[in-house]
Design a protein with these regions (language model features):
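… and, occasionally, acidic/histidine-rich disordered N-termini of signaling adaptors
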Residues: 1-158
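Short, intrinsically disordered, charge-balanced linker/junction segments flanking boundaries
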Residues: 167-170
Length: 170
């Protein structure tokens, strides 16, 4: 269970790296009184180089969220620009970056080459949310489109990395 950021929402996460060091990560933080910022990402590669690049991308994401920015598209372009500056290992980062409005249930999302989110309704029915998105970070400058979805009370937003889909296909 993630730290209790707000009583209006439950956050849970599971991270089981295939190796002792990996490139997947997630983060969530409160933005003001009524917003929750979140990210889930996967760095290409494995081992120490991926873990170091993951740490850098996580730091950039956390810094953007902690500055209480509420524009995922602008944050994505800034994170991508920073990652493009120092990428001697030619790595890339897939990411879903979003802001949840805790009052309205509106989720504003940006997808950088990441797995599409899934919404599970109160009856357990699932629907995959197809996002336009763009390429993974640190490949090319790109104007990442802002996408929106509305969560109803009791619905669950499920975010995964490709580790889940790879495990399902194994």
């Amino acid at each position: 269970r993630l730290r209790n950021l707000d009583t209006r929402v439950d956050l849970d996460a599971l991270l089981e790296p295939a190796r002792s060091v990996g490139g997947d990560y997630y983060d969530a933080m409160k933005i003001g009184d009524d917003r929750l910022g979140f990210a889930i990402a996967d760095v290409t590669g494995k081992g120490v180089p991926a873990a170091l690049y993951m740490a850098m991308s996580k730091a950039l994401t956390s810094a953007a969220l902690s500055r209480m920015q509420v524009d995922p598209a602008g944050m994505s372009e800034a994170i991508n620009a920073e990652l493009l500056k120092d990428n001697s290992e030619a790595m890339s980062v897939t990411m879903l970056l979003g802001i949840l409005d805790l009052k309205t249930g509106e989720v504003r999302l940006v997808c950088a080459g990441h797995e599409d989110p899934i919404v599970v309704d109160c009856d357990g029915d699932q629907r995959r949310i197809k996002l336009e998105g763009g390429p993974p970070f640190s490949i090319v400058e790109f104007p990442y489109p802002l996408e929106r979805l509305a969560l109803k009370p009791g619905e669950t937003l499920v975010l995964v990395t490709d580790g889940v889909t790879e495990a399902q296909n194994a």
